């Protein structure tokens, strides 16, 4: 959720990985490619039905994957992405009650099995996130929605964590930025070590086109 401080920590992840000698691509969703950025502008500014939001999000994601993410992974690079598919399940599925089985079908078609190795969820009560956002900028059309919408969004994120706990690392975003940064780096060190060990294994070459953390 915007206001949780994730963008700051995403940059710290990229800096740490580059310090380890990794080539890192930093991206975001919606967006990440020229076409996806144009779709992002529509999503954030134009009123539309929730199903239309979901379709635009997956259209942007499809182009993002084709244009940036898959080529980077195939080249052995890391991709760090500020938001990905979990946000569509949370905002459109949880917040706007779009059928999650339909979203899962779109996910399967667009991603063809590609998933992040690691997903960091910055968990924050909606009222705290709203107060933080109000202190720094005007709201887009999603951020302007009522607190009960963001309660549903938060529950949807929690459901995603429960369904795939090995992929997620949940961080208490009410903590200080310094503490969150320490938690994040401690986990990223482990993720990076596991990846290095896997890449060095006899089967590692076959894994080089796999997903990196998002």
Predicted segments with their positions:
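Short beta->alpha linker loops
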Residues: 30, 60, 84, 124-125, ...
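NTP-dependent small-molecule kinase module
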Residues: 12-14, 127-214
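ATP-binding Walker
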Residues: 3-4
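Hydrophobic/aromatic beta-strand patches that form the interior of the parallel beta-sheet core
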Residues: 27, 80, 118-120, 169-171
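ATP-dependent small-molecule kinase phosphotransfer cores
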Residues: 22-111, 183, 187
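A glycine- and Lys/Arg-enriched "phosphate-lid" helix/loop adjacent to the NTP-binding pocket
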Residues: 88-155, 159
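Walker A/P-loop
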Residues: 7
């Amino acid at each position: 959720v915007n206001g949780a401080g994730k963008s700051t920590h995403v940059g710290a992840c990229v800096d740490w990985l580059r310090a380890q000698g990794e080539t890192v691509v930093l991206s975001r969703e919606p967006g990440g490619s020229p076409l996806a950025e144009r779709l992002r502008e529509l999503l954030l500014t134009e009123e539309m039905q929730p199903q239309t939001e979901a379709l635009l999000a997956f259209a942007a994601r499809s182009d993002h994957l084709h244009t940036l993410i898959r080529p980077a992974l195939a080249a052995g690079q890391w991709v760090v992405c500020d938001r990905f598919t979990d946000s569509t399940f949370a905002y459109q599925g949880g917040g706007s009650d779009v059928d999650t089985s339909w979203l899962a079908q779109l996910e399967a078609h667009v991603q063809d099995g590609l998933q992040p190795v690691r997903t960091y969820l910055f968990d924050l009560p909606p009222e705290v996130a709203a107060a933080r956002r109000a202190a720094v900028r005007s709201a887009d059309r999603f951020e302007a929605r009522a607190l009960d919408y963001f309660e549903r969004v938060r529950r949807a994120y929690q459901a995603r964590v429960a369904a795939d706990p090995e992929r997620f690392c949940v961080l208490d975003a009410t903590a200080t930025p310094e503490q969150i940064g320490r938690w994040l780096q401690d986990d990223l060190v482990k993720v990076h070590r596991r990846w290095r060990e896997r890449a060095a294994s006899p089967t590692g070459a076959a894994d080089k086109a796999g997903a990196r953390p998002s």
